[in-house]
Amino acid sequence: MGDEDWEAEINPHMSSYVPIFEKDRYSGENGDNFNRTPASSSEMDDGPSRRDHFMKSGFASGRNFGNRDAGECNKRDNTSTMGGFGVGKSFGNRGFSNSRFEDGDSSGFWRESSNDCEDNPTRNRGFSKRGGYRDGNNSEASGPYRRGGRGSFRGCRGGFGLGSPNNDLDPDECMQRTGGLFGSRRPVLSGTGNGDTSQSRSGSGSERGGYKGLNEEVITGSGKNSWKSEAEGGESSDTQGPKVTYIPPPPPEDEDSIFAHYQTGINFDKYDTILVEVSGHDAPPAILTFEEANLCQTLNNNIAKAGYTKLTPVQKYSIPIILAGRDLMACAQTGSGKTAAFLLPILAHMMHDGITASRFKELQEPECIIVAPTRELVNQIYLEARKFSFGTCVRAVVIYGGTQLGHSIRQIVQGCNILCATPGRLMDIIGKEKIGLKQIKYLVLDEADRMLDMGFGPEMKKLISCPGMPSKEQRQTLMFSATFPEEIQRLAAEFLKSNYLFVAVGQVGGACRDVQQTVLQVGQFSKREKLVEILRNIGDERTMVFVETKKKADFIATFLCQEKISTTSIHGDREQREREQALGDFRFGKCPVLVATSVAARGLDIENVQHVINFDLPSTIDEYVHRIGRTGRCGNTGRAISFFDLESDNHLAQPLVKVLTDAQQDVPAWLEEIAFSTYIPGFSGSTRGNVFASVDTRKGKSTLNTAGFSSSQAPNPVDDESWD
């Protein structure tokens, strides 16, 4: 997306240019009558409805796409609509005319005023998230020209085009038209611009031609990308794609809602028996109670209101380490309280040392930045920070993609001490110079292994290289995750001081033992039938179903609804409003089944999730561990069922056997046979004998038990079993 006029967004009184559209019939030789006011209201609607007159504020013609030169159809059929695309060669040639906005007879877009902003509702006239077109009307049109999603037109992969108004859609081929039941931006049926349902090879809106929306890069004249695909589970930079107008509703402000907390399960007390490994020199001793942390009274009151009475192992070790000012890499099982482990000591320091940011400062300079890979997770961290800082002078702010940039800026300028952000939106805000980095004392990477891999690693390196960002010697850097592969540990050295401490709680990279794991051998074409069978036996118990692709998430959710199983879906192609609505429906029981991609695999803490079903196994074992960690949290028990396809999942056999064995789960004989008949370089045949699945890559460790705090010097580390 181009540069946004955030000053106009912040000032709602600034006037915005609103383009005026003409009637839907062609009136002008070159279609250059975009701003002429109609003589009467009836002028917009007169004349019979024709296929050539596609819609108001729509495309130039229902036949303008699918040709190499869209102008050919216009010149031949002499028809156009006002407010959409003019004549010329703007589309149908795999891109834009000159890849920029132009005016004149051959303009691909109308020209916009420079003071246009996201707050203007007319900004809905533009491209939808996956390449479709919006005309500012959220309601669907009736009749054969019905629009799907939220006004988007596209083919199989988000391009332009609509099925023929005269063709009947085959329900077996097209479960959803364009967005369908779940409002997703992913249709199934491809179609060219002239109504044909067959694929085109050049200028059509189908999968094999034309503009494919978010999945296709558009190269501008300067050689830079105007649009770029976003990674699943993450977000794209706000400098790309259309402007976003969504403003999320504020969270409830009443004290009961702020301090609503997760109920611990019957196995919570078993945490005391988990072994803890601390690596590094001069590690401070662990604490046993919150009182030993010497926190201020307000913070202790908030801890009590939140229902925290007992420390988890990761909290016992991490809190004193952070209070001592040491850099930390902490690895603990899913659902073990890692968020509180870093928030509490950071807040304690800030309240003791005083804060610098306030709403009276023009440039906000937060003391702490917390970065997480997904929007849902970063919002969850913000709610925890707001809870623990309740009644204090510390103000937490959350910013993430999919929401209006102006809204994010307005939240920051009101005062920001702790900034919770996703990488893309954070870099946009820094680029707008709305925050300063000179006062940063704490940098936290949650789900750090994901933040440092190829998905977000470059953005994180850019962050620590930003002007004003204190060097790693002048700030405290904290990393938390349930999995820390060795290569990620090596990358982390660029962010951490050389004397950082490594805390490994229990089975590093291992699954939570409170989750009962079952692996079923199910072929690809038998999965749907098996899924329905399991869900019918489960009943209304809350269940998450994981699939590998966004398209399949919507397809499976639609299929389950047809089977009378209330289901919703969440994935990276859904608008943020839709993602939040889906999570809300699942969280509050309206839809007991949530079909998700990896966007929901990490960090999400949804109470009372009893089942996780891996409809598709992930590509890595680490992702498997994170997925099944959505259940069995805080000492509660859960169940995970995975469908193992012999044709596509053999590469996971050995690491899966190891995870099952380490978590003391039953291993099917057929899975062991596959595992030990498959050679994976670097993988040891033994699945037992090493207490920790992966260890600190440095030397000098002490293994401790959280119950007795006995320590013993561990021998020099041996080569790990590489199973990630």
UniProtKB/Swiss-Prot annotation:
EC numbers on record: 3.6.4.13
Keywords, comma-separated and alphabetical: ATP-binding, Cytoplasm, Developmental protein, Differentiation, Helicase, Hydrolase, Meiosis, Nucleotide-binding, Phosphoprotein, Repeat, RNA-mediated gene silencing, Spermatogenesis
Chief location of this protein within or outside the cell: cytoplasm
Phosphoserine: residues bearing it: 222, 226, 722
Short sequence motif named Q motif, residue ranges: 288-316
Localization in the cell: Cytoplasm; Cytoplasm, Perinuclear region
Compositionally biased tracts (Polar residues): 30-42, 704-715
Region (Disordered): 1-246, 704-724
Domain Helicase ATP-binding: 319-502
Biased composition (Basic and acidic residues): 69-78
GO molecular function: ATP binding; ATP hydrolysis activity; molecular condensate scaffold activity; mRNA binding; RNA helicase activity
Gene3D superfamilies to which the protein is assigned, alphabetical: P-loop containing nucleotide triphosphate hydrolases
CDD domains: DEADc_DDX4 (cd18052), SF2_C_DEAD (cd18787)
Biological-process GO terms, alphabetical: cell differentiation; flagellated sperm motility; gamete generation; germ cell development; male meiosis I; male meiotic nuclear division; piRNA processing; spermatogenesis
Ranges where the record places region Interaction with RANBP9: 228-247
Catalytic function, reaction form: ATP + H2O = ADP + phosphate + H(+)
Bias type Low complexity, positions: 195-205
Tissue: Expressed only in ovary and testis. Expressed in migratory primordial germ cells in the region of the gonadal ridge in both sexes.
Keyword Oxidoreductase among record annotations: no
Binding site for ATP: 332-339
Motif (DEAD box): 446-449
Family per similarity comment: Belongs to the DEAD box helicase family. DDX4/VASA subfamily.
Function: ATP-dependent RNA helicase required during spermatogenesis. Required to repress transposable elements and preventing their mobilization, which is essential for the germline integrity. Acts via the piRNA metabolic process, which mediates the repression of transposable elements during meiosis by forming complexes composed of piRNAs and Piwi proteins and governs the methylation and subsequent repression of transposons. Involved in the secondary piRNAs metabolic process, the production of piRNAs in fetal male germ cells through a ping-pong amplification cycle.
Assembly mode: Found in a mRNP complex, at least composed of TDRD1, TDRD6, TDRD7 and DDX4. Interacts with RANBP9. Interacts with RANBP10. Interacts with PIWIL2 and MAEL. Interacts with BMAL1 and CLOCK. Interacts with Tex19.1 and, probably, Tex19.2. Interacts with RBM46.
Protein name, as recorded: Probable ATP-dependent RNA helicase DDX4
Organism: Homo sapiens (Human)
